């Protein structure tokens, strides 16, 4: 049998990624956006440690034909485990898995029997995939197994994964077989909430809570800085028409905490993970640009010149007890936050106890770096044209900067009030550090304070 060169060449062309851009040209725009983000990460150094892997993940997922990431495996907001072994996509809507179950695009198991275009049929094994199995034979097998058929609209038969009527008209064709790619497996770390928790462990291992222990009332500044979260939630829900879950995920951008934003969005609105992650980390990188105008607008020259007294250092015992007590209180009062806060405090305890130096270094360096790579590249992979190039994305980006600005304003305004109540002993500039962008926000407070008064040293107070 000779080789048809024309058909072979045409097959090469039609299976190439370049050809697939003809049917999905918007993916080219996503490739361009990924390149812009790579430029910002490398040249402008905007949060490069995470923005670079996010951008590269976005690039990989939009190089069509690579099959490195499949949104279908995570449809409905959770991992569809039955599909990871390979599944057939029928009519773009329903999935038949390899063990005879049927789930819809939302990942719900509809029945323990196969469902084909509204027909409930029993799982059928075809020894010869080219043979035809009349629908009547399927019904006979149903009866033999003691099952009752339902919603039988017309006679049909199966042939090699395609569904035909009794007259031979095709009802639906079997689509691609879903075989999980590399990023599908790595994305499970996001889906299951593993990566954000491990990053918090690394953050805790490098954080000094001594200033907070020495001056507990500054905890209120962190609470006030969450104003942006709540106000953005209201705007997103009431004005822009997002669902309550989506609005909550968008509002968390105001906390200026990337891992928390990813963790919460993965729980509440996973379809918005790409836009929210990019917005959260972009605004974290822009802290030195966004915060100073707000800080100067809400404070007077006199307030910015206030020199705060140096804090009394926290004792070693206090630093060891602190993460243990916080973990217990948070787990009892707010159990849903226990995974994140528990990992944060575990890392901090490893730092402060003084007997696990090797673990502390691993958490801060090797573990943190590896997880950051996996987190970034998989979050970027969710940013496909269908989810990213929408009006909703522009609304998310706009509300994100509002959330960030309002969070900064909330912290500064409460710091002004605390300054009044303390008789002028608190510099309101430290209020902007109530957002979770550590240590960037604290550095901004330090810089603005020294601009007003070179003798000012606000860094530890802001931390």
Positions of PLM-derived features:
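Low-complexity, proline/glycine-enriched hydrophobic segments characteristic of transmembrane helices
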Residues: 1-13, 71-181
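Structural signature of hydrophobic alpha-helical transmembrane segments
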Residues: 19-30, 184-199, 244-252, 281, ...
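Hydrophobic transmembrane alpha-helices of secondary-active transporters
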Residues: 37, 187-213, 348-350, 368-390
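Alpha-helical membrane segments and immediately flanking helix-loop junctions
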Residues: 192, 200-206, 223-231, 243-271, ...
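Entry/N-cap segments of selected transmembrane alpha helices
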Residues: 211-233, 386-411, 462-463
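Alpha-helical transmembrane segments
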Residues: 271-289, 399-407, 430-433
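Membrane-embedded hairpin module used as a gating/binding unit in multi-pass transport
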Residues: 279-355
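Transmembrane helical segments that form the transport core of multi-pass membrane transport proteins
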Residues: 327-411
């Amino acid at each position: 049998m000779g080789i048809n060169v024309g058909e072979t060449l045409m097959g090469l062309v039609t299976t190439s990624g370049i050809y697939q851009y003809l049917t999905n040209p918007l993916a080219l725009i996503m490739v361009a956006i990924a390149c812009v983000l790579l430029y910002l990460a490398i040249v402008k150094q905007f949060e490069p440690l995470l923005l670079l892997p996010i951008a590269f993940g976005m690039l990989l997922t939009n190089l069509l034909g690579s099959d490195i990431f499949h949104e279908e495996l995570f449809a409905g907001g959770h991992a569809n485990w039955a599909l990871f072994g390979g599944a057939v996509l029928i009519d773009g809507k329903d999935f038949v898995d390899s063990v005879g179950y049927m789930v819809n695009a939302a990942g719900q198991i509809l029945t323990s029997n196969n469902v084909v275009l509204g027909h409930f049929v029993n799982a059928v094994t075809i020894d010869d995939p080219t043979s035809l199995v009349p629908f009547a034979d399927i019904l006979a097998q149903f009866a033999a197994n003691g099952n009752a058929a339902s919603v039988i609209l017309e006679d049909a038969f199966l042939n090699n994964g395609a569904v035909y009527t009794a007259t031979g008209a095709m009802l639906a064709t079997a689509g691609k077989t879903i075989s999980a790619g590399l990023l599908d497996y790595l994305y499970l770390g996001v889906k299951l909430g593993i990566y954000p928790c491990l990053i918090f462990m690394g953050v805790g291992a490098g954080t000094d809570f001594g200033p907070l222990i020495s001056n507990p009332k500054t905890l209120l500044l962190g609470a006030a800085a969450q104003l942006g979260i709540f106000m953005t939630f209201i705007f997103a829900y009431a004005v822009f028409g997002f669902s309550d879950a989506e609005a909550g995920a968008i509002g968390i951008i105001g906390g200026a905490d990337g891992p928390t934003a990813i963790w919460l969005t993965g729980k509440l609105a996973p379809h918005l993970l790409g836009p929210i992650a990019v917005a959260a980390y972009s605004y974290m990188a822009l802290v030195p640009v966004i915060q100073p105008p707000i800080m100067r607008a809400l404070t007077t020259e006199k307030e910015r010149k206030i020199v705060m007294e140096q804090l009394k250092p926290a004792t070693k015992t206090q630093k060891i007890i602190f993460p243990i007590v916080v973990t217990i209180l948070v787990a009892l009062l707010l159990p849903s936050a226990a995974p994140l806060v528990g990992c944060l405090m575990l890392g901090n305890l490893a730092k402060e106890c003084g007997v696990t130096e090797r673990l502390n270094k691993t958490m801060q360096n090797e573990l943190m770096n590896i997880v950051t790579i996996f987190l970034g590249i998989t979050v970027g992979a969710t940013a496909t044209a269908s989810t990213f190039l929408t009006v909703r994305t522009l609304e998310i980006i706009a509300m994100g900067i509002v959330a960030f600005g309002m969070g900064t304003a909330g912290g500064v305004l409460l710091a002004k009030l605390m300054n009044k109540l303390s008789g002028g002993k608190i510099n309101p500039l430290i209020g902007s550090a109530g957002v979770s962008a550590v240590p960037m926000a604290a550095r901004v407070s330090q810089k603005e304070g020294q601009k007003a008064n070179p003798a000012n040293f606000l860094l530890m107070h802001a931390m």
